[in-house]
């Protein structure tokens, strides 16, 4: 990010091992020395895929961890990865944000965390008809449309209506 002192980053949380989420992880973690947190499955996949230097300080987050004065909660998500998750971050004043992308469906635990958050980033990945009629190979279409793929725009919209009805005021779409 523009103006961000990368050396001030103490920890990075990885949701899953797909390259679009961690392509620079190995280099940045080595250069700046921040700690990496993820699920055990993701950490093992990162190491097996040579996406994380063996000497990088890394730890498994099973439920939640406190970093400085922030509490970070891990919530499992359904995605075609080793052990994907999303994260809910809570500040000392109780304000919280949930970042939930790369999931085929909205599981009850993710929905509950979203309903309890002040700010929610939610995946809005594809228009179902455009995807079905698009140029992607059939196996990729099936992967995206599966319950371990990506949340459709329609499914996201239904979740957003629920969140607004529950009182969530700050929402952002993610991809």
Model-derived regions, located:
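Core dinuclear metal-dependent hydrolase active-site scaffold
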Residues: 1-4, 61-119
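Active-site metal-binding motif and surrounding structural segment of the metallo-beta-lactamase
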Residues: 1-38
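Short, surface-exposed connector motifs at secondary-structure boundaries
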Residues: 6-9, 29-32, 93-94, 166-172
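Active-site neighborhood of phospho(di)ester-bond hydrolases with catalytic His/Asp-centered motifs
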Residues: 9-17, 37-40, 98-102, 121-123, ...
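Glycine/Thr-rich phosphate-binding loops of Rossmann-like dinucleotide-binding domains
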Residues: 22-23, 46, 107, 130
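Short, charged/polar "capping" segments at the starts of alpha-helices
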Residues: 42-48
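Cap/insert and terminal regions of metallo-dependent hydrolase folds
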Residues: 108-174
